[in-house]
Structure formats: C-alpha cells, structure tokens
C-alpha cells in the first residue's frame, strides 16, 4: 500500500513539473516575434517603418562625426587636454575601441538585420495590393543596399549577411572584400529599388499618398546608385566604367526631376533647401531622414547647430554648437567669391 502511494505521489509530481515547464515556456503576450509578425499588409509596413527608425543616429554618428569631421569641409580643433570623440576622429588619432565606431557599426547592421527579416517575410504575407507589396520590398532593398554601402565606405572589408541568421551562424560569416560587397550586394539591391514608384506615387498600407513622409523612392534609388558608382570610379577601386554609369544615373535624376525648375535664381531661393517648409519636405530634397515632431528628435542638432542659422557675414568662422568644430576656411572663402 505504501509503495502504491509513493507511485501516485511521484506521478503527480511529474505532472506538476511538466505543467510548470509548459507554463514557463509560454510566449510573452506583449511582444510579437518576426515569426508572428509580417502577416498582413499593415504589419509589413510597420516592419518597414521600423527599419527607417533604425536610422535615427545616422545624421549624428555617421554623417557628422564619421564623415564631415574627417573631411575637408570641417576643421576640428585638436584637444590634447580632454577626450572628445569628434576631436580624436577629426585629427585621425582615434583608436579602435572608440564608442562612436561601435555605435556606427551596430546601427548599420541593425538596419541590415531588420531589412533581411522584411525581405524574407513580406513575399509570403497577405497583401491586398501587389504594387504595395513590391514597394515595401524595394524599400527594404534600398535600405539594405545603402547600409552596406556606408559600412564599406567607412570600414572597408566587412561581413556580408544577406538573410536572417542566428548568432551562432553569424559568427561563422567571414569578411567579404569591399569591392565584392559593392558589386554583389549594394548595386544589385539598389538596382532592385529602382523599381520603386516616383515620390508622387508612393503609398502607405492603406493606399494613401506618402510623398512627404521621407520614404525612399525611385529618385532616391537612382541618386544612391550614382554615389556608389562615383565611389567605384575613385581610389582605391579605380573602376574605369563606373564614371559613365554614375553620369547616366545622375542624368536620369535630373531628367526625372524636371531640373529646370530646381534652379535657384537668388540667395533667398537657394536657402530654401536648408529651411523646412510647412510640410517639411522641399523640392530640393531627393531623400532625407525625417524626424517626427514631438518624437525623440534629431541628436545631431545639438552637435552641429551654427550659432547663426543664416550668417550675416560668410567670412567669419562660425562655431558649431559647443563643440570645437568649424567650417573649413577655404570652403568659407568660396562663399565670399563673386
């Protein structure tokens, strides 16, 4: 009898433990994984918007610190008495453990990861409109191609991940050469994105026009392709065919944009390209990362805002924000020339 009771108690304990295991394995109800997402047209657009959201830091870490501060456009004051990332980068003293390098790397690979998920999921999602499906897919291709282009431009050889992978899989991915990534990933992705609609024909998941929402369109794809070809035409690639390809793309951009309407006959008109209109978008913008009013904002503003938005005298050396980053004097001289 005692043995039978022990068997019953043991069986009850096993059932209880199994039940607890099942309970602990219950998926969280407040989060949707990629396997449960990308089921509908609306969810697919949310995923695409999530990729654009990954770009929040691009203007700051990518284009300001990692690009302009290292260029001939800006002069960065050496600061031997204090650590300032912009100073270390701008004077080419930065070491490989600098946080800005890591932040930039992670930002672009987050774009790539999310784009890979979208590209793998959208084809099997339920869509009411095939044209909208193709638009969303081509936006993902544009963003992935752009991300790899910037990684190559900054870091050279990098790992090329073209599908969703587990962490263990990614560890086994070796670096690809920069020219291989440009020719076999960046250009093919951007060529696919050339099938995007023109700005006026871009739609959201509900079919509404989104021509002023800052999303990549056909013109953005052509202009980005031109950037890639111009990069290939120069050092260290020296591709002899790339210059003519860039010229063709830029001619297409000018032809499609009715270039005659974009001429600025006066300084006031020229300044409009830097000043937001009521709708934020302006005719001089091909593609720009936009920040929602009332959102978290553009972090670069606090690092690059001139003391005077419209300087009265271009011959002065204007300090950007509180950082020791200045407009390069020879560039300012060009604005003083008649």
Identify the function of each model-found stretch.
Residues 17-19:
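C-terminal motif of bacterial Sec signal peptides marking the signal peptidase cleavage site
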Residues 3, 164, 291-293:
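Short, flexible loop/turn elements at secondary-structure junctions
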Residues 40, 45-59, 81-155, 171-184, ...:
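Conserved, well-structured interaction surfaces
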Residues 1-8:
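Bacterial N-terminal signal peptides that target proteins for export
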Residues 157-179, 184, 236-244:
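Short coil/linker segments at helix-helix boundaries
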Residues 129-136, 143, 210, 217, ...:
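Structural signature of alpha-solenoid helical repeat junctions
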Residues 21-83, 190-194, 215-338:
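An aromatic- and glycine-enriched ligand-binding surface/loop that stacks and positions planar moieties
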Residues 119, 151, 159-161, 285-289:
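Structural recognition of the beta-strand scaffold that forms the well-ordered cores
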